Amino acid sequence: MEGTRSRVRITVEAEVRPTEDREKVLKAVRNVVEPESVRFEKIGSTEILVGESSTLASLSRLHSILRAERILDAARGAMKKGVQGADRMTIHLHKQAAYKGRLSFVSSDHESPMGAIRITIEHPNVREVIDWLAPPTVRGRPVFERRMPE
């Protein structure tokens, strides 16, 4: 199991704007993802929340919300657009929606007034991760449900 965990890396990043409260940005992130570690980095005048995890279990909330909100098709499309090679994908979520426990996919930081939450998933087979998080659907219902990839 430990060898598998080291092949998985999840990085969550969200800018903390000067008018924002760090705790609210952290809440927005934790409403969607459960990182194992969180830190705040200062890059020039910009502060960024960085969360990291080495297990897909940290995406369990995202998995559940996608089903509760019935947005598997939109999520699958956003995830497929974010694929970078066989082992990496990045998605962007609207920060204010995440704060309220909702999901809204955006294509860039500019679509979220306070900046987006960027989630980068590295896994040996990122397509398996997509199939687990957002399987294909027929009439809004998943064609299959996969177990969490290792």
UniProtKB/Swiss-Prot annotation:
Report the InterPro entries cross-referenced here.
Answer: PAB1135-like, Ribosomal_uL5_dom_sf
| Name the UniProt record assigns to this protein | UPF0201 protein APE_1751
Family under the similarity heading: Belongs to the UPF0201 family.
Q: Which Gene3D superfamilies match?
A: 3.30.1440.10
List the Pfam families: RNA_binding (PF01877)
Tell me which stretches of the chain form a coiled coil: none
